[in-house]
Amino acid sequence: MASSNFFLPTALIALVATQAMAFDPSPLQDFCVADRNSPVRVNGFPCKDAKDVNVDDFFLEANLDKPMDTTKSKAGSNVTLINVMKLTGLNTLGISMARIDYAPKGQNPPHTHPRATEILTVFEGTLYVGFVTSNQANGENKLFTKTLNKGDVFVFPQGLIHFQFNPSYDKPAVAIAALSSQNPGAITIANAVFGSNPPISDDVLAKAFQVDKKAVDWLQAQFWENNHN
């Protein structure tokens, strides 16, 4: 009985610890403004000396009220990310945000955020959005999709492949996203697979995608852009 009584709280502690490690570490003081010039290398950034912190460490004139240029993007979108690299006061706070502009028929291509869940709301226009589950025991990857209108909200679970697409032929769309990490990261699937440096062997990709090497070589020869700013 004693061993049983010991096992349950131990298991619960292990479970809680596992969940805690799955997210950005919680702050242990009021704030920890990132010192990006420090030679110290840690997971995140060391803290700026508190006596040197000022109000501008928590402020950014981001101009998120203004439309962003989508004309230079093959995807027809522009992601303006506000993370700890742009706003040092976000360090240890476990949050960031982005404005996403979509040209007519533009998209934010299938991608993942390895370190963050994303919640998105539409400010203008209409978006067709979705995410795909991880590999399931039955071999399926289930797709969840929804058409969002102005004011609607949608959540993309951490690490899952997701996308947004503006179905309109003549109207742009705008969304604002919040992410549960100071530095969520983004892996655009096509870019990573076909635009890596050095390139992945076409033998590997031809077999993985069940196409011939010519198709792989053609894809690898394309210019794979980054629509995140």
Swiss-Prot record:
It comes from the Eukaryota. Disulfide bonds join C32-C47. Keywords: Apoplast, Disulfide bond, Glycoprotein, Manganese, Metal-binding, Secreted, Signal. Belongs to the germin family. Residues 62-217 form the Cupin type-1 domain. Glycans are attached at N78. Its main location: secreted. Residues 1-22 form the signal peptide. Mn(2+) binds at H111, H113, E118, H162. PANTHER family: GERMIN-LIKE PROTEIN SUBFAMILY 3 MEMBER 3 (PTHR31238). GO terms for molecular function: manganese ion binding. The keyword Secreted applies. May play a role in plant defense. Probably has no oxalate oxidase activity even if the active site is conserved. This is Germin-like protein 12-1. Oligomer (believed to be a pentamer but probably hexamer).
